[in-house]
């Protein structure tokens, strides 16, 4: 077992869960932004060292709720399906994003604990060889 192959999976998982946390935080920061489409993170296994990679997809999901506005001119960027006097709200679901944050933080914590364990195991192996 080489040092690279032992540490590669938890390090890539830390990176992937960090990306997932950033996406959820971005979605929550824009929960009140009209027309915002929440991003989603999917995780893929990497074949060579069985690491993890995060893929971010933005601008997905259902339409947001229609919010009535009065006295504002129609924004040219507003989709044609939105009636006059309304704007499309954000499609971010706060409950879903909070659950995603909990999952990603627990995954991050678990993989962060793997690194000192691998370090200790490799230290034991080195001590046995000496």
Spans of model-derived segments:
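Amphipathic alpha-helical polymerization modules
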Residues: 1-130
